[in-house]
């Protein structure tokens, strides 16, 4: 069974507002003023999609916004982002991560190993292209995930919150592989 595409969107907000539109097959952007219900809409859409596609819910990804707690306490936001990023880089137990993907290479055929190495190299190249202006680059070697600068190696949590958020989004999409997927991003 393949994941159903979103063609018609029909979501109720707060039991009084109905949002309806015909969706494009590739990218759709929802815009509105603060408090207009964009985040609520995305949460409701995600829940609806998961309910309809329960067997393939791992192919439906919701990336919530990292709350603007940063204005009040930058440490909380940076910590939440860094923890989320560390999870998708290193977690070996509960979900897809870069390291679990690399470990899967051990039992893979030579052809599968080469394909995975090429995918990781493409991911690295994409991230490095985005980080080029800040003279940072990502290196993925074995179980090491490093951010390299002119002054040496940085821990992931030393990246700016914007850099961590971009890296997290790209990593989540990368971990989906070539599977048909739906990705909902709130305030990228």
Q: Predicted regions: what is each one?
A:
Residues 27-28:
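Conserved beta-strand position immediately N-terminal to the Walker
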Residues 1-13, 31, 40-158:
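Phosphate-coordinating catalytic segments in nucleotide- and nucleic-acid-processing enzymes
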Residues 12-15, 165:
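N-terminal pre-P-loop "Q-motif" helix
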Residues 48, 158-185:
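GG-anchored amphipathic helix commonly corresponding to the ABC/SMC/Rad50 NBD signature/C-loop
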């Amino acid at each position: 069974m393949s994941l159903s595409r979103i063609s018609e969107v029909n979501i109720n907000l707060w039991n009084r507002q109905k949002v309806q539109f015909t969706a494009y097959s590739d990218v759709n952007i929802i815009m509105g003023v603060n408090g207009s219900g964009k985040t609520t809409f995305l949460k409701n859409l995600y829940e609806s999609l998961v309910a309809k596609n329960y067997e393939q819910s791992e192919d439906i990804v919701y990336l919530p916004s990292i709350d603007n707690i940063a204005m009040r306490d930058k440490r909380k936001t940076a910590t939440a982002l860094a923890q989320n990023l560390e999870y998708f880089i290193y977690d070996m137990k509960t979900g897809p991560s870069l390291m679990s993907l690399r470990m899967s290479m051990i039992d893979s055929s030579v052809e599968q190993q080469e394909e995975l190495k090429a995918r990781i190299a493409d991911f690295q190249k994409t991230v490095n292209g985005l980080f080029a202006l800040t003279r940072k680059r990502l290196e993925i070697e074995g179980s090491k995930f490093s951010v390299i600068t002119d002054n040496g190696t940085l821990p992931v949590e030393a990246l700016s919150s914007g850099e961590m958020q971009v890296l997290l989004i790209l990593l989540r999409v990368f971990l989906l592989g070539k599977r048909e997927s739906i990705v909902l991003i709130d305030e990228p």
